[in-house]
From Swiss-Prot:
Domain of life: Eukaryota
GO (cellular component) term, any one: nucleus
Transmembrane segments: none
Gene Ontology terms for molecular function: DNA binding; DNA-binding transcription factor activity; protein dimerization activity
Keyword Nucleus: yes
Protein name: Transcription factor bHLH131
């Protein structure tokens, strides 16, 4: 009985050693198989990377980019260096000088225009031109305010001097509209050696209203002669009658 037990124990130990050696063999075989699979799955680097082809592609891209840049430069694109503070100040000063020069030219041109428009300008300096411009503007403004907007229904005639100017008179009259009216007015002024420098005429419903600015009146005596000459025209007399009456009026004044 003891002998059988000993045999069984020794057989068990042999089986255990055999099992352990088999396990190690299987493990080694598994590792070998894994390594073989890894070697089969890996490819040489040369298959994935071709240095010659890569360098050629990069070279083409580089030269193509350079050609594009040269085209941009040839079309007007340029790279400029940032300007220094001194250069920036010089550029700003030049721009300011050019703008100031243009402004002075524009002002001088406007003064030259005013010198040709103002009727009673004596001095040509800028201060005198500005003063005369203000005075003449106020004079014209007052003239416009005194002119009626519509012709009167009654014949009337009004004359006065313009702002103490003894040579310039303002004449405003209303009368019935008729053919040749303004020609008769011109002949009446010519008879007393006066000349209209500005005229504003309005005709509404068969009535005419006229505002004249007349030069050559020569004081109160000339104003009286002009009023007598124009009054005959406003009242509807013919130009010949107006001329004859005006001559008679002149003789009457001389006799007085």
């Amino acid at each position: 009985m003891v002998l059988l037990h000993h045999v069984s124990l020794s057989h068990y130990q042999n089986s255990s050693s055999l099992f352990s050696s088999s396990s190690e063999s299987i493990l080694c075989l598994f590792l070998v198989l894994c390594v073989m699979q890894l070697e089969q799955g890996m490819r040489p680097i040369s298959r994935c990377y071709n240095p010659t082809a890569y360098s050629t592609t990069m070279g083409r891209s580089f030269f193509a980019g350079a050609a594009t840049s040269s085209k941009l430069f040839s079309r007007g694109f340029s790279v400029t260096k940032p300007k220094s503070k001194t250069e920036s100040k010089e550029v700003a000063a030049k721009k300011h000088s050019d703008a100031e020069r243009r402004r002075r030219l524009r002002i001088n041109s406007q003064f030259a225009t005013l010198r040709t428009i103002l009727p009673n300008l004596v001095k040509q300096d800028k201060a005198s031109v500005l003063g005369e411009t203000v005075r003449y503007f106020n004079e014209l403004k007052k003239m416009v305010q005194d002119i009626p907007t519509t012709p009167s229904l009654e014949d009337n005639l009004r004359l006065d001097h313009c702002n103490n100017n003894r040579d310039l008179a303002r004449v405003v009259f209303s009368c019935s509209d008729r053919e040749g009216l303004m020609s008769e007015v011109a002949e009446s002024m010519k008879a007393v050696k006066a000349k209209a420098v500005r005229a504003e005429i309005m005709t509404v419903g068969g009535r005419t209203k006229c505002a004249l600015f007349v030069q050559g009146v020569n004081g109160n005596e000339g104003l009286v002669k002009l009023k007598k000459s124009l009054k005959l025209v406003v009242n509807g007399k013919s130009s010949s009658e107006a001329k004859n009456n005006n001559n008679g009026g002149s003789l009457l004044i001389q006799q007085q």
